């Protein structure tokens, strides 16, 4: 199994890079993980709803074009299914047993396009809270690492 994180936005603040890199390094011994940083559509100051929809479509095309054949696409969005850490660990164990490669899509500041939502095998919510997409990167990689630490009996998870 391989995990690829498809994320919109290439320039992140230093605190995001620091937090993400820490967990990214930790997870590698458990599962091969890759980050694909896709460009964010250029936005203006007073964008209309039609403009925002167009930006999401452009970013959605980037996400779909980055998918590899036979990858299971999972869309991260506030309206998705919530999982406990233990359920995530079980789900990841199942992916590994089935040999599934997984692509996790994080949208830009305006979310994911309808095309990405329709293409996704399932939708996952890290929280009912709306979060900035840079913060989602850190929360996602930490939860993936925590789930893998459970599956490998590593002492990181102490619930």
From Swiss-Prot:
A GO cellular component annotation in the UniProt record: cytoplasm
PANTHER family cross-referenced by the UniProt entry: METHYLTRANSFERASE (PTHR33603), RIBOSOMAL RNA LARGE SUBUNIT METHYLTRANSFERASE H (PTHR33603:SF1)
Coiled-coil regions listed in the entry: none
Keyword Disulfide bond attached: no
Annotated InterPro entries: Alpha/beta_knot_MTases, RlmH-like, tRNA_m1G_MTases_N
Residues annotated as binding S-adenosyl-L-methionine: 76, 107, 126-131
GO molecular function per UniProt: rRNA (pseudouridine-N3-)-methyltransferase activity
Annotated function: Specifically methylates the pseudouridine at position 1915 (m3Psi1915) in 23S rRNA.
Taxon lineage: Bacteria, Pseudomonadati, Pseudomonadota, Gammaproteobacteria, Moraxellales
Identification of the protein by name: Ribosomal RNA large subunit methyltransferase H
Catalytic activity: pseudouridine(1915) in 23S rRNA + S-adenosyl-L-methionine = N(3)-methylpseudouridine(1915) in 23S rRNA + S-adenosyl-L-homocysteine + H(+)
Enzyme class: transferase
EC numbers on record: 2.1.1.177
Record bears the keyword Acyltransferase: no
Protein's cellular compartments: Cytoplasm
Family indicated by similarity: Belongs to the RNA methyltransferase RlmH family.
Main location: cytoplasm
Pfam families documented for this protein: SPOUT_MTase
Quaternary assembly: Homodimer.
Keyword terms: Cytoplasm, Methyltransferase, rRNA processing, S-adenosyl-L-methionine, Transferase
């Amino acid at each position: 199994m391989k995990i690829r994180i498809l994320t919109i936005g290439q320039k992140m603040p230093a605190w995001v890079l620091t937090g993400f890199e820490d967990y990214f390094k930790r997870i590698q011994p458990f599962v091969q993980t890759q980050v694909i940083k896709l460009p964010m559509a250029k936005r203006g100051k007073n964008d209309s709803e039609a403009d925002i929809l167009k930006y999401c479509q452009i970013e959605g095309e980037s996400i779909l074009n980055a998918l590899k054949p036979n990858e299971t696409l999972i869309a991260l969005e506030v309206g998705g299914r919530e999982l406990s850490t233990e359920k995530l660990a079980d789900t990841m164990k199942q992916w590994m047993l089935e040999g599934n490669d997984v692509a996790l899509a994080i949208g830009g500041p305006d979310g994911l396009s309808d095309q990405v939502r329709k293409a996704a095998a399932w939708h996952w919510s890290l929280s009912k809270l709306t979060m900035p997409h840079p913060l989602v990167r850190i929360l996602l990689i930490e939860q993936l690492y925590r789930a893998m630490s459970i599956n490998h009996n590593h002492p990181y998870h102490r619930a």
